[in-house]
Amino acid sequence: EKNIHARVESIGADGALLTIKSGEIYRVNFIEKILATTLAKLSNFIPEAGIWMNTQRPEWNDANNALVGNGVSMVTLYYLRRFLSFLDQTLAKSITQQVEISEEVSNFFKAISNTFTQNISVLDNVISNTKRKEITDALGIAGSNFRNQVYLHSFSGKKATLDVKELISFLHVALQFVDH
C-alpha cells in the first residue's frame, strides 16, 4: 500500500494502476478484463450451491432481498449466469478468432477450464459432497494460485493466445455447471 501511495504521489492517479515487473503500467484488452472478472467469480463457485461469499457479508442485491450473507450467493450466481450467456452470444457473432491475454490469466483460465472439463461427468447425477468439495477446492486453488502469482511477482508482461472457439466452449461447460 505504501508503494502505491508513493507512485500516486510521484506520477498521479495512474500510480494506483497495476504494473508489470519493469514498473510500466499494465494494459490489457477488454476480453482479458472481463475474463479475469469471470474467472474470479468461477474460482469461488460451489457446484449446486452458488458463489462463495469470501467476506461473509451480503452483497447489496442479497441484502435488498433479505438474504443472509452467510455461505453462498445465489444472486451473484444468477448474474454470473446471465453474463456467461451474454458473452457466449456476443463471441458467437464475433469475427475475431484469437485474442492475446496475459500468460497469468491464461494459466488461470486453463486451470478453471480443466477443472470443469475433467469433472463434466458429475453433471449426469446429483453431485456428491465429496466430489463437490473436490471441484470447489480445485477452483479455489486456481484462484489462489493466480492471486499469489500476481501479488507476489506481478504480471510478467508475457502474452498467450486464446482461441475464441476455446473460450466459447469453456462458456458452454461453465453454463452447464451453473445450470446444474
Predicted features along the sequence, with ranges:
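Acidic, mature catalytic/reactive cores of soluble proteins
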Residues: E1-H180
